UniProtKB/Swiss-Prot annotation:
It is a multi-pass membrane protein. GO terms for molecular function: NADH dehydrogenase (ubiquinone) activity. The keyword Electron transport applies. GO terms for cellular component: mitochondrial inner membrane; respiratory chain complex I. This is NADH-ubiquinone oxidoreductase chain 4L. Its EC number is 7.1.1.2. Gene3D superfamilies: 1.10.287.3510. It catalyses: a ubiquinone + NADH + 5 H(+)(in) = a ubiquinol + NAD(+) + 4 H(+)(out).
Length: 98
């Protein structure tokens, strides 16, 4: 396995670990999700370019579009929670809370 793949995989693992550890604030969770999506995008792009997958050339762009939509929805949720509760705690997103 080349060093590039190992580095990208480690970036994904670090982002996943950050998501599991720092899950109290919504902003830190969103940043970790963006790190995961970025590492997946780079891994997919490197794989497509190295293996000359001509049919999968659009896959990294589609993943990037989904990442942008996820970021926009996450930021709108962050603004809504911040305006409603005054903080960005993830526990405020619990729908069973009254």
């Amino acid at each position: 396995m080349p060093v590039v793949y190992v580095n990208i995989f480690l970036a994904f693992i670090v982002s996943l670990t950050g998501l599991l550890i720092y899950r109290s604030h919504l902003m830190s969770s969103l940043l970790c999700l963006e790190g995961m999506m970025l590492s997946l995008f780079v891994m997919l792009t490197v794989t497509v370019l190295n293996n000359h997958f001509t049919l999968a050339n659009m896959a990294p762009i589609i993943l990037l579009v989904f990442a942008a939509c996820e970021a926009a929805l996450g930021l709108s949720l962050l603004v809504m929670v911040s305006n409603t509760y005054g903080t960005d705690y993830v526990q405020n997103l619990n729908l069973l809370q009254c």
